[in-house]
Amino acid sequence: MIEKSVAFVEGVSKELYLKTGVRFVIDMTDFEKNPIALALKKERQNYQEGFLKQLKPPFVVFFFYHDAQKIELVANPKDLLDTDKIFFEKIAPLLPTNAKEYTSQRISAMLINGYSVAVDALAEKYHVNIVQNFNAPKGVTFVKVVIYILLLTLLGAFLGLYFFKKS
């Protein structure tokens, strides 16, 4: 992940933990620095089990295996988060389709998008506001309102000029 993304995740994770008690971790295996064999599903499951034993519930872990090109989103307890919905609706559409697209920027965008949506879902469940998160749906609503106001203003100006010129 790129540096800005790491700083964003650390800040949001800290705020999420302080407000909800839920830990949210992104685990990215770095095969250049730590060459462990995780190409097979069984190897990844064993790695995940070992990693998850270190954490105390409630938690969410986002596993990203670069070389295997696999992603796992794990929540404990399982009803903490709808991991399948987040994966298939928010992460899967951004998955690279070939090896050339596996750039650090693309990976960061994909992980941050899924992470941000998951944090929003947790914040909503715990009735808290995570200030440092993107809050994408709220931003989209704000932009739509501004566009509608501008359109109505232009329409009003046009109609006003049209009717006042006639009289």
Please provide the spans of the model-predicted regions.
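Folded, non-transmembrane soluble domains that reside on the lumenal/extracytoplasmic side of membranes
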Residues: 1-141
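C-terminal single-pass membrane-anchor helix
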Residues: 131-167
